């Protein structure tokens, strides 16, 4: 997980850890722990909320939570190559 990019997106949106903690229904301490951990500690449902709260594109979501592994895997599957530009907003 790219913790620096996650924090940068939060700051860019003028949100505090407290704001995201409230949106996720967790304590501020838990949010701090999740945001500072190199290992992805977010549940799938929490990631969906963060996509909305941080207004993340697919590329940003992939970069933050999966270190671009989703994109790498999709590029290997030829049938997905035609939809990749749509996912990235290109």
What are these regions (language model features)?
Residues 33, 59-90:
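Short, charged recognition helix plus adjacent turn
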Residues 10, 21, 51:
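The alpha-helix within a helix-turn-helix
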Residues 17, 28-29, 58:
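The DNA-contacting recognition helix of HTH DNA-binding domains
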Residues 25, 43-61:
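DNA major-groove recognition helix of helix-turn-helix/homeodomain DNA-binding modules
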Residues 6, 20-21, 31-34:
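Conserved hydrophobic/aromatic packing and binding residues within compact polymer-binding modules
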Residues 25-42:
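Recognition helix of helix-turn-helix/homeodomain-like DNA-binding domains
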Residues 7, 18, 48:
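Residues within the helices of the helix-turn-helix
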Residues 1-12:
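A short, Lys/Arg-rich alpha-helix, primarily the initiator
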């Amino acid at each position: 997980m790219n913790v620096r990019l996650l924090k940068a997106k939060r700051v860019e949106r003028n949100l505090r850890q407290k704001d995201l903690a409230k949106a996720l229904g967790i304590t501020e301490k838990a949010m701090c722990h999740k945001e500072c951990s190199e290992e992805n500690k977010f549940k799938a449902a929490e990631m969906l909320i963060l996509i909305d709260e941080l207004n993340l594109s697919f590329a940003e979501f992939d970069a933050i939570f999966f270190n671009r592994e989703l994109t790498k895997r999709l590029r290997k599957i030829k049938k997905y190559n035609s939809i990749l530009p749509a996912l990235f907003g290109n």
